[in-house]
Amino acid sequence: MSATAKPKLYNSRHPERTLLYRTVAEHDETWLELASAGQFDGEGDHHTPKPFVRKAFAKYLECGIFAHGFARARCGDCGHDILVAFSCKGRGVCPSCSTRRMVETAAHLNDHVFPRLPVRQWVLSVPKRLRYLMQRDSATLNMVLRIFLRVIAQSLQAHCPGAANADKANLHIGAVAFIHRFGSSLNEHVHFHVCVVDGIFEEVAGAEAAAGGAADAEPSALGVSFHSVSGIDSNCVSQTQATLRRRILRAFVGRGLLGSFEAKEMLAYQHSGFSVDAGVCIEAHDRSGLERLLRYCARPPFAMERLRKAGSELVYRCAKQYSEPSSDKRGAKADELTLSPLELIDRIAALVPPPRTHRHRYFGVLAPNSPLRAAVTALAAAPAQPTTAHAEPTTTCGGANGPAPMGEPIAPKLKPAPPKRAAHYLWAVLIARIYEIFPLLCPLCGGQMRIIAFITHSADIRQILNHIGADSEPPHISPARGPPLWDDDGDAQMGDGVQTQPDWEMAAQPVPDYEVDQRVNW
């Protein structure tokens, strides 16, 4: 008889011990002073760090620190207590909270939004000169995203034999678009990852209307039929890329962001800078693969495990190779980024998203105001008993025939139950989903623990932490530091009682070998 495997136990993460936390705690105030003075972009007071960026770094320095408050959990069997520190719930800076948000988004989309149908990822990247405009203007970014989704819908309709004779007004796609504002080397790189159900949804009348009783049927009694696509290959992607290239450039010219002659030049480029990829497709039965894809699309811009220290500098290992300027103008490929602590903080600060800005958006039948959303998202749950409706033959991502997960048509019930809104995922459930460790498991008896109190008053926090022998003071945050003192016989002059000023010309930065506009060239 095999012994039962001992469950994994949850341990506090102690962010103050990580390299990123120590770097931010030591250099954040200095970076704020230098960034406000235009040290990094040369714009001075015109580019003072935004208040939400300051707040993101300040909240990160409090995240996971017991001295700033915690929750108390107790085991109902043996009475053992544990403390769980509060989190900042920030976006962009804190790796732990960004990971939690990533897992929660992927779990919600996988469990409650995407039906059990094939899902394909479409990725669009545009030239650098267009990225700059999209990064600074949300209306331009929305325009490009709408063009991308319309071209995807047209491409799917063209490769959908089952919807060839259908009314175009009743054909819809189902998609969730993720807006990435970052690249793999901590650079500003606006591009789109769109997860699209690999097929077309057709809006059809409900069962009452099909039986001839549409006179007294409710207008919302609609059904939906799914038609799969075939032939999404490299030729289809190339045609889609060429269409996007023309339409996006035409839209930029129409908005006055590009001249007509500039658009003609960009259309004539051999390497246009436009890139479309649709090679990743998840089968209908592979729900774990779909969740991994959604985590990749919802990932944060910074991965703490890729950061290491090399002397006085920091080295960040990039997921992909990037180009560095070289003397032959061809660029040298590198997969590691060497930065000073201030440069690292400045790059992370540029990637902090503004507040109340959506990181992903819903389109087609998955849009919140779509009348077909309830019928489509109901298929995201685990499959129930097989229905007697006729199943339309379909194809999977690889092109093999198989039974359609949806009949034709699928109509709602006469008295559908009121929709139940999906609850927020609990912190303990997300921890278990990521690390396969349930945090509210008693380390002594293995019993179930529950939260019994939230400690927020500073006096109570210090009393409890001092009682258990933990540090009751938060980690030290270094104040802003000025430039170093120069020692070119200044001590001798000071010894004579003469007050002298340092030679500020020695602190000037050397003239660069080449001029680079960092706002455009990533």
Outline where the language-model segments fall.
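Beta->alpha loop/short-helix hinge microenvironment recognizer with preference
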Residues: M1-W522
